[in-house]
Design a protein with these regions (language model features):
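C-terminal beta-strand-loop-alpha-helix "lid" module of Rossmann-like NAD(P)-dependent dehydrogenases
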Residues: 1-295
Length: 295
């Protein structure tokens, strides 16, 4: 049986760990709330961009744009996968789930090329058979619009240059505080029919009756809106992934705190047993010594 000193040392170590997990839980809770507020505050702007794109599609049908599905290219030769992971661990299966989803997607694509966001994703795929084109890292802070612009500009420039023929985005979607699942989204090339189906949710009946004039042309206005649209999609995915990460870390820290408290309770019982055994032994020795002196 362990002595009292060993039990006390273990209890002290677990108490220190418990303080850390509770502090990380509080920090993740605060970051989660802030991320949700930011997502709610920026959503109206990018929703407005989507509405404007619907207006153009409704008016022009299928404007000529290099962002739509290209013809005469002989199919898809290279596919880019933008994967959103984190820069820190201690978030349960958050990063592992994303990396597995990306691996599964890459296995179905022809010549996949990786654009990674987060250092953990880079460490996971650096020795994989897939080529890493670029790695972005934001040091575990709340993503900003400029971060999304940096990624969107890179993706769009490489797409227009012909480095790849299509772009997939993989991130963690937060269905609820306890349900986080990897999600895939095809962001390039655009498909007019798919966009119409998605964008008709925006008060389509009222807007269909409105007439807009686009200067200098619908094609030029549309091409100017697409980078903003893609930036909005990427930014929303970054913030949602950030919020999901904080939720996963909060859940992991709650579980760790619960386990630490259970271990402390068990150690306290063990400590009491060891202490009681020591007291019993001392009393027995005193009684035995007293009896020997009486004889």
């Amino acid at each position: 049986m362990a002595n009292l000193r060993d039990v006390r040392l273990r209890m002290r170590a677990i108490q220190q760990t418990l303080q850390v997990t509770k502090a990380m839980n509080l920090i993740s809770t605060a970051k989660l709330r802030k991320g949700r507020r930011v997502l709610e505050d920026t959503e109206p702007f990018f929703t407005r961009i989507q509405k404007s794109m619907y207006d153009i599609l409704a008016a022009a049908g299928h404007p000529r744009s290099e962002f739509f599905v290209r013809t005469g290219r002989g199919g898809v030769h290279h596919s880019a996968v933008v994967a959103v992971t984190s820069d820190k661990g201690l978030a349960g299966g958050y990063n592992a789930n994303i990396c597995r989803r990306v691996t599964g997607l890459c296995s179905r694509l022809e010549n996949p090329l990786l654009i990674l966001i987060g250092s953990i994703g880079y460490r996971y795929f650096v020795n994989s058979p897939y080529l890493i084109l670029e790695n972005f890292s934001f040091r575990s802070r709340l993503p900003e619009v400029d971060d999304a612009k940096q990624i969107a500009d890179y993706v769009i420039s490489q797409y227009l240059w012909g480095m790849f023929d299509e772009v997939h985005l993989v991130y963690t979607h937060m269905y609820s505080a306890v349900k986080l699942q990897p999600a895939e989204r095809h962001i390039l090339p655009l498909d007019a029919d798919t966009m119409k189906a998605e964008l008709t949710q925006f008060d389509s009946r009222e807007r269909a009756a409105l007439q807009f004039e686009y200067i200098p042309s619908t094609e030029q206005v549309f091409d100017a809106l697409v980078p903003l649209y893609i930036k909005g999609v990427i930014y929303g995915s970054l913030v949602e992934a950030y919020v999901s990460e904080q939720s996963a870390r909060m859940t992991a820290m709650e579980e760790s705190s619960r386990n630490a408290e259970e271990m402390l309770a068990d150690l306290q019982l063990n400590y009491n047993r060891v202490r009681q055994a020591g007291i019993t032994q001392e009393v027995t020795e005193i009684i035995s010594g007293s009896a020997a002196l009486s004889d």
